[in-house]
């Protein structure tokens, strides 16, 4: 099954219908990011069984024209947010790759699910949709992923790590580190070497490594 089919099915469930209705009401008087057409974009790229890596973010960027539906990613032409700068620093430290393109859709096209734990946010109000009920969607995503094996989970920060018990730890690889935010990246994220560890695991299990 494609991830796109999965999310279409989820939008028919009452919990997600309620979330969407709540957001539609908010949009009568408030700007919400990302744009409506991009809110489920992370599910657009591949089949569920093609999932190689899951990167779990928090909520989308709340400044205008930044969030694009993929966690940590921004479109070309935008300034790099602090978290993405630190992700690229960690990548260079690990694999000596000097990445400058802030659009991570090339990762998504290789089977990297770039999923936020909360999929929407009010403009200039971080965590404003934190209690909207997205937890059920994330749990359903992880339930689908339990049918797969040899997937690498990159859990950055406490919010991402709170989902660790939903992962089959015997059949997959879980890599945890502090969040790449400028407030916490110095607590181990910058030197975690998750990118090489991820690819080593994929190669070991006869899966194509990610071109970071």
Curated annotation (Swiss-Prot):
Query: Per its UniProt record, what SUPFAM superfamilies does this chain match?
Result: Uracil-DNA glycosylase-like
Cellular localisation: Cytoplasm
Q: What is this protein called?
A: Uracil-DNA glycosylase
List the EC numbers from the record: 3.2.2.27
- Domain of life, per lineage: Bacteria
Function description: Excises uracil residues from the DNA which can arise as a result of misincorporation of dUMP residues by DNA polymerase or due to deamination of cytosine.
Gene3D superfamilies, alphabetized: Uracil-DNA glycosylase-like domain
Q: Catalytic residues per the record?
A: 59
Instruction: Give the family this protein belongs to, as stated in its UniProt record.
Output: Belongs to the uracil-DNA glycosylase (UDG) superfamily. UNG family.
Query: Can you state which reaction this protein catalyses?
Result: Hydrolyzes single-stranded DNA or mismatched double-stranded DNA and polynucleotides, releasing free uracil
Its cellular-component GO annotations read: cytoplasm
Extract the GO molecular function terms from the UniProt entry: uracil DNA N-glycosylase activity
Give the top-level enzyme category: hydrolase
Assigned keywords, A-Z: Cytoplasm, DNA damage, DNA repair, Hydrolase
Organism (species): Ureaplasma parvum serovar 3 (strain ATCC 700970)
Q: Which BP terms does GO give this entry?
A: base-excision repair, AP site formation via deaminated base removal
């Amino acid at each position: 099954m494609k991830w796109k089919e999965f999310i279409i099915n989820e939008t028919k469930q009452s919990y997600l219908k309620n979330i969407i209705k709540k957001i539609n009401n908010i949009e009568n008087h408030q700007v919400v990011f990302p744009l409506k057409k991009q809110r489920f974009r992370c599910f657009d790229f591949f089949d569920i069984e093609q999932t190689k890596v899951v990167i779990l973010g928090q909520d989308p960027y709340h400044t205008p024209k930044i969030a694009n539906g993929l966690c940590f990613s921004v479109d070309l032409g935008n300034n790099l947010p602090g978290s993405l700068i630190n992700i690229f620093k960690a990548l260079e430290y690990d694999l000596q790759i000097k990445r400058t393109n802030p659009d991570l859709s090339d990762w998504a096209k290789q089977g990297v699910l770039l999923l936020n734990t909360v999929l929407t946010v009010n403009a200039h109000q971080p965590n404003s949709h934190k209690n909207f009920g997205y937890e059920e969607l994330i749990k359903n995503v992880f339930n689908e992923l339990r049918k797969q094996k040899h997937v690498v989970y990159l859990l950055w920060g406490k919010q991402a790590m709170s989902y660790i018990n939903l992962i089959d730890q015997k059949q997959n690889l879980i890599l945890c580190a502090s969040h790449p935010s400028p407030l916490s990246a110095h607590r181990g994220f910058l030197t975690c070497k998750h990118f090489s560890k991820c690819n080593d695991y994929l190669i070991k299990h006869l899966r194509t490594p990610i071109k970071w």
